[in-house]
A protein has these predicted regions:
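PLP-dependent aminotransferase class I/II
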Residues: 1-174
Length: 174
């Protein structure tokens, strides 16, 4: 790494605790406000202090309701610019979903030896990684909305998100 990049990185790394703190605080304020809605099941956070807060995941009872709620939230303005990926049903999350990763599905190695698939430990592996391999995860993907939490949300932005959720959830009946 040259000196210019290193100096930029050094400055940016100093900002990281503030960025993470802002995301974390925004996420938990929104999450707490939505806690009164019984139809939302929030993801269990194993390490709340270690959670950066970059995503709010809300899970609903079935895929159809999830899609309807997602469309309604987007109609309320909970979206990003065209280049952003936000307020989506997790099945739309591209390469972050196991069955959308070509190198995993096709067992493409990372080197000339086709590792890790050519390793002795994997020689008898018959596992397929297409959709349906992990039905519990697949079900969660279909029933979960992913909302990215930027570090620059204002109090007004947070209230707009909370209001949109409350309006949409009220229209679906609590």
């Amino acid at each position: 790494m040259d000196e210019i990049r290193a100096s930029i990185l050094r400055v940016q790394l100093k900002k990281l605790p503030t960025v993470i703190s802002h995301m974390h605080d925004s996420k938990y304020r929104i999450r707490t406000a939505l806690g009164q809605h019984s139809e939302i099941r929030h993801r269990r956070i194993v390490d709340p202090d270690g959670d950066t807060g970059c995503f709010l995941l809300t899970t609903f009872k079935d895929p159809d309701i999830t899609k309807q709620i997602n469309r309604a939230l987007r109609a309320e303005g909970i979206v990003t610019l065209a280049q952003g990926v936000n307020d989506i049903v997790m099945t739309q999350w591209g390469l972050h979903i196991y069955y959308n990763i070509p190198s995993l599905v096709h067992k493409t190695g990372v080197d000339k030896r086709n590792s890790p698939w050519s390793l002795v430990e994997n020689k008898d592996s018959r596992t397929k990684y297409g959709k349906g391999t992990c039905p519990v995860a697949d079900g969660l993907f279909e029933r979960t909305i992913l909302l990215a939490i930027p570090s620059c949300l204002t109090d007004r932005d947070e209230q707009d998100i909370i209001h949109a959720f409350e309006k949409v959830l009220t229209s679906f009946g609590d």
